[in-house]
Amino acid sequence: MKRLLFISFLFIGCQNISTEIIVDPDVEDMYIRYNKAWSDGDFETITNEIYSVPFSLYLQDSTVILDSSEDIKNFLIMTFNELESNNYGYSIRNSWESYKIDDNLVIVEQNFTRFLKDSTIMGPEERTASYILRKSEGKFQISGMVPHTTIAE
């Protein structure tokens, strides 16, 4: 009986082990810079350091390919203007939902929350977006994104 009880506790304890996803430190660093730049509406940093050309945006009903830095910059300016009109304040990452690395390619999903300027939650408490990253010249950049909610709301 004691043995059965011990095995039961061991089994229950194993079910509660955290499955926290650990990402490559270079990916983590890039996302810290990305989330800060996004929260600051810093389209220059995102255009020049975070997104790569071409950049693919996979929406629910279409795919948008941004073929130049100028296209990316214009897309970001339009997006940040819409966010500003919706009283957007900032975003925080809550967790990584998934992470897969294959040499110079990464597929990662980020769970995040957006806040209004008064620090109340903007829209859904938890949002997700999936990203395709490519390592080029020693650094990761985002080459594609699948937003699972509307980007500017």
What are these regions (language model features)?
Residues 55-67:
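A short gly/proline-enriched turn/hairpin at secondary-structure junctions
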Residues 3-13:
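Sec-dependent N-terminal signal peptides
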Residues 14-49, 58:
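Short, low-complexity N-terminal intrinsically disordered segments enriched in polar/charged residues
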Residues 50, 61, 110-112, 146-147:
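A mature extracytoplasmic/lumenal domain signature
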Residues 71-118:
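Surface-exposed, charged secondary-structure patches
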Residues 34-38, 42, 50, 54, ...:
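Sec/Tat-exported extracytoplasmic proteins
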Residues 34, 46-47, 54-55, 72, ...:
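Hydrophobic pocket/interface hotspot
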Residues 124-153:
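Short beta-strand edge/turn micro-motifs at domain boundaries
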